[in-house]
C-alpha cells in the first residue's frame, strides 16, 4: 500500500495470483479524522491453461516450418495452423518460438546452413497467441542493413535480444516492433543466449568450429568479454545470479556448469543433451539419436545436482508425435 500526502489517492499492489482459486481480502482504512472505509477485494484466479503452440522447424530449404495447436481440454492437436489462419507459409527453418507479454515471437532462420541470407527469407514473425494471426513480419538485418539469419531470442525490460549468424546480438523493441541496436561479437555463428545480472551471454558455435561464449553489456550493447569453452557451445540457460549452464553439440552432447565470478567450467556427468530449458530449479534436457531413432530426456536438479531420466508415456498423455510438417 502506498499513499502520497495531498493527492487523496491510495494505491494497492498485490502479488500475482498463481493459485487455481480466486482469493479475497478485507482492507480497512482509517483517516486522521477518524473516518473509516472498509474495502472488500477479490483477486481473480490463475487463468485456465487453454493449450500450447508447437513449432515445427521443417526441413531446411523446403519452406515448410509450421505451427500446431494442442488443446489441453480435448487432447486434440491441430496441425498446420499458421497457413490455415494466415493464408501464407510461416517460412523456412523455424528455430525458436517464445512468448513475451501479449505477443509470441517465431524466429525464422531461412534456408540452407550458410551464414548469409537473402532478402525476405529470414525474419521474426510476431504473432497474437490468442488467435494465431500474424501481427508483423520483421525482416532481420545486420547493423549495415544486410539480410541476416536469426537463431534464438530472449527478453528483458521490454526488449528482445536475438542471436544472429552475422556474429551479432540484435535488439528488438517489443513496443515498436523495430530492430534498434546491434552488438558485434568476436565469435562466429551465434546460437543460444541468456541474460544474467545485466549481461547477455551468447554461445558462438561456429557450427562446430568455435569455442567461445561472448559477454555483452545489456545497456551499452557492446561485447565486454569472452569465455573460452569446449568446442561447439550451442544452448545456454541462467540458473540464478552468477550461475549458467550451457551445452555443446555435435560430436559431444555434454552439459556444463559455468560459475561467473571465477569463470569456472564444470562438466555434469550422466546427461546427454542437444536442447534444454530451465524451470523452477531444474534443467530439462533432450536428445534424439538419428541413428537409433531413440530419444533421451533428463531432469537435472541444480541444487542437489541429481540427474533423473524422464520417461514420457506419449500415448497415455494423449499427445501424438508431431512429425508431419
Range-by-range predicted roles:
Residues 87-99, 144-155, 187-197, 229-240, ...:
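Repeated scaffold domains used in trafficking and secretory/extracellular systems
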Residues 61-69, 114-125, 168-171, 208-215, ...:
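Structural motif
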Residues 52-62, 106-119, 162-166, 202-208, ...:
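Conserved beta-strand positions in repeat-built beta-propeller and related beta-rich domains
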Amino acid at each position: 500500500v502506498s499513499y502520497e500526502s495531498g493527492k487523496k489517492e491510495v494505491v494497492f499492489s498485490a502479488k500475482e495470483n498463481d493459485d487455481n482459486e480466486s482469493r479475497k481480502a478485507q482492507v480497512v482504512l482509517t483517516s486522521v479524522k477518524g473516518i473509516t472505509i472498509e474495502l472488500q477485494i477479490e483477486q481473480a484466479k490463475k487463468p485456465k491453461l487453454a493449450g500450447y503452440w508447437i513449432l515445427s522447424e521443417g526441413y531446411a530449404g523446403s519452406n515448410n516450418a509450421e505451427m500446431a495447436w494442442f488443446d489441453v481440454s480435448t487432447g486434440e492437436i491441430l496441425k498446420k495452423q499458421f497457413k490455415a489462419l494466415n493464408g501464407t507459409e510461416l517460412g523456412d527453418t523455424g528455430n525458436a518460438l517464445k512468448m513475451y507479454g501479449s505477443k509470441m515471437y517465431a524466429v525464422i532462420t531461412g534456408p540452407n546452413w550458410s551464414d548469409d541470407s537473402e532478402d525476405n527469407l529470414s525474419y521474426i514473425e510476431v504473432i497474437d497467441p490468442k488467435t494465431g494471426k500474424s501481427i508483423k513480419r520483421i525482416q532481420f538485418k545486420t547493423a549495415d542493413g544486410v539480410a541476416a539469419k536469426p537463431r534464438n531470442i530472449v527478453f528483458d525490460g521490454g526488449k528482445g535480444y536475438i542471436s544472429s549468424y552475422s556474429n551479432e546480438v540484435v535488439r528488438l523493441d517489443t513496443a515498436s516492433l523495430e530492430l534498434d541496436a546491434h552488438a558485434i561479437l568476436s565469435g562466429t555463428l551465434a546460437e543460444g543466449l541468456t541474460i544474467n545480472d545485466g549481461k547477455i551471454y551468447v554461445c558462438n558455435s561456429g557450427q562446430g568450429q568455435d569455442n567461445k561464449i561472448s559477454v555483452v553489456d545489456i545497456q551499452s550493447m557492446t561485447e565486454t568479454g569472452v569465455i573460452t569453452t569446449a568446442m561447439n557451445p550451442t544452448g545456454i540457460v541462467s540458473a540464478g545470479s552468477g550461475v549458467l549452464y550451457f551445452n555443446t553439440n555435435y560430436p559431444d552432447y555434454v552439459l556444463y556448469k559455468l560459475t561467473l565470478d571465477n569463470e569456472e567450467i564444470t562438466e555434469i556427468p550422466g546427461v546427454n543433451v542437444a536442447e534444454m530449458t530451465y524451470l523452477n530449479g531444474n534443467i530439462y534436457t533432450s536428445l534424439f539419436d538419428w541413428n537409433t531413432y531413440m530419444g533421451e530426456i533428463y531432469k537435472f536438479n541444480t541444487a542437489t545436482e541429481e540427474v533423473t531420466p524422464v520417461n514420457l508415456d506419449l500415448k497415455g498423455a494423449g499427445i501424438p508425435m508431431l512429425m508431419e510438417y
